[in-house]
Each structure stands twice: as structure tokens, then as C-alpha cells.
A protein has these predicted regions:
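Cytosolic juxtamembrane helix and N-cap/initiation of the first transmembrane helix
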Residues: 1-15
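Membrane-interfacial loop-to-transmembrane-helix junctions in polytopic alpha-helical membrane proteins
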Residues: 1-4, 42-45, 65-72, 96-100
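Hydrophobic transmembrane helix segments
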Residues: 15-46, 51
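Aromatic-anchored segments of alpha-helical transmembrane domains
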Residues: 18-19, 81-89
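Core segments of alpha-helical transmembrane spans in multipass integral membrane proteins
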Residues: 44-65, 79-82
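Membrane-helix boundary connector in multi-pass membrane proteins
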Residues: 67, 86-103, 122
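Membrane-interfacial loop-to-transmembrane alpha-helix junctions, especially the N-terminal start
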Residues: 71-79
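Membrane-water interface at the C-terminal end of transmembrane alpha helices
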Residues: 110-126
């Protein structure tokens, strides 16, 4: 079970790195996958903000995991669960959202909460 949580966390971090890099390098396809469409007029500021946020978060998760700082990773995941919660509400509030675009955000919330609680519960205070 311990390995399952480890690899789920690693996959989560690596996916965030991928999503962040995609928002930085390919903003429009990333926006579509996120679940909204905005008229940017060539201004990709939102995309770059989201991209660096996800890239940074993914890198930190991977670093904490590889450094075996599981308790810190747990707190990061719990606190970070607010990000997919807000992303979910942003997509849902968009007038022409597709239900299928909500699932990745909902899954991310569940993963953050389960993984975060697991690491906090199974690691001792230092």
C-alpha cells in the first residue's frame, strides 16, 4: 500500500509538471484541456500564471517525495487541495463547460486529500 501512495504522489507531481509546461508552451490546447475557453486576443497571461503555478507545485511535490519528506508532502497536498477545488468551481461557473472537463479537477481534489491525510497519518512528527 505504501508503494501505491508513493507512485500516486509521484504521478501527481509529474502530471502537474506536464500540465504546467503545456500551459507555458502550448497555451491554447492546454486551456481547452483545462475546461474553459477565454478570448485572449493574443494575451496569454492567464495561461502563463496557471502554467508556472502547476509547474512549481509539481516540482515541489516531486522534490519532497524524492527527499523522503513525506510529512511535508502531506501538508503540501492538503493545503494544495484548494487549487483543484477552485479550478473545479471556475470550470463549472463557465457558461459552456463540459461535464467531462470537471472530472480531472474532482479527481485531483480527492487525490490531494487522500494522499495528504495518508502522509500526515503515517509519518511521525520530527
Amino acid at each position: 500500500m505504501k508503494q501505491l501512495f508513493y507512485y500516486l504522489t509521484l504521478l501527481t507531481g509529474l502530471l502537474l509538471v506536464f500540465i504546467g509546461a503545456r500551459f507555458l508552451l502550448l497555451p491554447m490546447p492546454a486551456e481547452t484541456a483545462f475546461g474553459i475557453h477565454t478570448a485572449t486576443g493574443g494575451d496569454y497571461s492567464f495561461h502563463y500564471i496557471k502554467g508556472i503555478r502547476d509547474l512549481f507545485t509539481g516540482v515541489i511535490i516531486v522534490i519532497l517525495l524524492l527527499a523522503r519528506e513525506f510529512r511535508a508532502a502531506g501538508f503540501l497536498l492538503l493545503a494544495g487541495s484548494i487549487i483543484p477545488m477552485v479550478d473545479f468551481s471556475i470550470v463549472m461557473s463557465h457558461a459552456d463547460y463540459e461535464t467531462a472537463r470537471l472530472y480531472p479537477h474532482a479527481i485531483a481534489v480527492v487525490l490531494c486529500l487522500i494522499l495528504g491525510f495518508h502522509y500526515i497519518r503515517t509519518t511521525a512528527k520530527s
